[in-house]
Each structure stands twice: as C-alpha cells, then as structure tokens.
UniProtKB/Swiss-Prot annotation:
Pfam families: Rep_trans (PF02486), RepD-like_N (PF22477)
Protein name as catalogued: Replication initiation protein
InterPro entries: REP-like_C, RepD-like_N
Biological processes annotated in GO: DNA replication
Species name: Staphylococcus aureus
Function statement: This protein is probably a specific topoisomerase involved in initiating replication. This protein is specifically required and may be rate-limiting for replication of the plasmid in vivo.
Gene it is expressed from: repC
Keywords: DNA replication, Plasmid
Amino acid sequence: MYKNNHANHSNHLENHDLDNFSKTGYSNSRLDAHTVCISDPKLSFDAMTIVGNLNRDNAQALSKFMSVEPQIRLWDILQTKFKAKALQEKVYIEYDKVKADSWDRRNMRIEFNPNKLTRDEMIWLKQNIISYMEDDGFTRLDLAFDFEEDLSDYYAMSDKAVKKTIFYGRNGKPETKYFGVRDSNRFIRIYNKKQERKDNADAEVMSEHLWRVEIELKRDMVDYWNDCFSDLHILQPDWKTIQRTADRAIVFMLLSDEEEWGKLHRNSRTKYKNLIKEISPVDLTDLMKSTLKANEKQLQKQIDFWQHEFKFWK
C-alpha cells in the first residue's frame, strides 16, 4: 500500500530535526583528570541497510516510477528483479523475488549512508522508495565515532575471543585495526580517517588528526546498537608502573606482539587483560559510551524515521 504523499509529510516536518540527522551532537562528558584534553567524539550512523518485501502490485508500480524518474539509474531489469542507484549514486536499491523466495528472505534491499543525504533527499527516499515496502526493517547499522585525536598509540583490545587484525602505515605505526570478521554480526574497525580521505582524494581534513572507531552491526545485532561495544577497550597502558618484574616483562611482550596472546593459557590471558586495563589512565570507550548515552534519543529518532510511518517529533 502506497503511503501518504510528500505534501502531507512536509506539513508535519520541523526542519531542524532532519537537518540534525547527520549532525549528532557532542556530549558534555569527560573521562577524568588524565583525559581532559581529549575532545568528545562526533557520533553518527554512517551506513544503513533496510530490507523489506514488495508485493506484485507495488513491484510493478515502483518499477514503472523508477523507469521514468530522472534521479534514478536503473539496470538489470526483468519482471522479477531490478537494480538501481538513486540520488547521484548515493543510494543502492536491489529487488530480486526469485532469489528471495529460494533463500527465504525479504526481496528488496536499500543501502545508503544517511550522512550523505540532505533533508529533502531523506524525505524523497522515504516517500518514493521505502514506502512501497512491507515488513521492512534494518539488517545493517554502522555506528561511527570520530576522534580528533591520534589513536595510533592507543592499545585496543576486546574482553571477548575475537579475531584481531592490524595493518601498519608507512611510518610503522598502526593505521587500521579490525576486530572480528567482515561477515560476522559485529565487525569493529579503528582506522586513520584522515589518511583514508587523503588516499581516496576526498575532501581534505583540516584538523591535525581524525581517527574513526566504526562498529558495523548486522542481522540480529542491529537491535543492540545502543549497547554493542561493552567488551571493547581503547587504552594507553603504562607498563612501567607494574611492580612485579615478571608481569612487567610479559605485559610489555603482549603489547609489542599480538601473536604472544595465543601462547597464553585462557586464565593467564584474562589476568593480563585485566592488568593492562588497570595500568591505563584512560579508556576511550568510556567516552564513547557517555557520548552514545547523551545522543541515544536523537539516534533512536533517526531509526524511527526510517522504520515507521511519517510521524515527526516536536
């Protein structure tokens, strides 16, 4: 069933709400006396995937609309499937009924970065594309925390047994850290965003540093976006403060070579992870949690906007 028209939606819209979708604020929190110089990260949803079902009538109606809409580039068109990009290639759309039926999944998928869409583009996408879908919901949400801080010297670890991969830059310092695997329900990336933009010839970053902690959530994990990194720690451990010589040597070894963790017994791994947390005056994930808490309601409004009928808040 096609939902209400654009004019009716716009009557209820307060402009600042959608304008702020990609500009989630900074929290006023700080960690402690050791970290007052660290600015709060900027927080946003950086990627979204929405899936749903098109019934036969809506599939025909949407296909007809897309074939004449100048903001859409359509290809791979058959009676039961199509692919498209919309809004200057910022939105990817795919419909495949045969594949969906054979794999027992929903037949339409829409992928986009909400940070790259204007308020009017969000309304256009919601009204003209998403409104055709039934039983729609998120299958991917990416939370992005942007720090104007050099995170290359921080030590990141997880309380869980997840795969950790590190890539080093030309200067020998860590430039990208991965936790988990790409196809898992949660995949964490910590990387030098300023360097990435430079490599991709994107807009220059004016700040001295820009690092991103990005948490990619898929499938069932999207429901836990507001509590999805409690096991993660981004630390500055001071191994020299450890009194016991043997422990000090082992911690130094573990901080210097990730492969050494695999040689420890499980109980020893737990012991030294706790010790590393104790000797760090800062854990940036505390700042991430307080920032997320301060912005949770605004982020939930974004989710509600995409998932529900057009009901705008005051």
